[in-house]
């Protein structure tokens, strides 16, 4: 599973922040593999709106600039929180065709969907999730 959230990185629980930091770069690798196999953006069914579940990762295939910028924010936030992260480099995506390197500005409704999913996860284990190392709900 690869998680890409739309919530501000500064508002993510520590666990969500680390998970996204680890998982987001997988999308760059997946797109590179598809490009190497001759795929173009038009070969994918990309939802016109943000979705969770099936199609969630594919939604971002033509939005790699958004993901690149988000990875910069994730790394900065991890360092700000004092996390010991090993990889602080942001992937150079200039080798990927331009049609995949679009930017994205999430709509408020999309951000709300993303936040609702995070809230749902936190509600399932309220004492486990932390923010700056402190329990969100003690």
Swiss-Prot record:
The active site is at residues 2, 23. Changing residue 87 to N: 20% decrease in DNA glycosylase activity. The keyword DNA repair applies. Pfam families: Pyr_excise. The keyword DNA repair applies. InterPro entries: Pyr-dimer_DNA_glycosylase (IPR004260), Pyr-dimer_DNAGlyclase_EndonucV (IPR021143), T4_endonuc_V (IPR024796). The record marks 26 as: Transition state stabilizer. This is Endonuclease V. It comes from Enterobacteria phage T4 (Bacteriophage T4).
């Amino acid at each position: 599973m690869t998680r890409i959230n739309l919530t501000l990185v500064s508002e993510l629980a520590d666990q969500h922040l680390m998970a996204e930091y680890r998982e987001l770069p997988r999308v760059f690798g997946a797109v590179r593999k598809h490009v190497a196999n001759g795929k173009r953006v038009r070969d994918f069914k990309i939802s016109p709106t943000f979705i969770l579940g099936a199609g969630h990762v594919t939604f971002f295939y033509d939005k790699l600039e958004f993901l690149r910028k988000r990875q910069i924010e994730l790394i900065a936030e991890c360092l700000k929180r004092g996390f010991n992260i090993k990889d602080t480099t942001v992937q150079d995506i200039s080798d990927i065709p331009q049609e995949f390197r679009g930017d994205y500005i999430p709509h408020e409704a999309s951000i709300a969907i993303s936040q609702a999913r995070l809230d749902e996860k936190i509600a399932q284990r309220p004492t486990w999730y932390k923010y700056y190392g402190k329990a969100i709900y003690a």
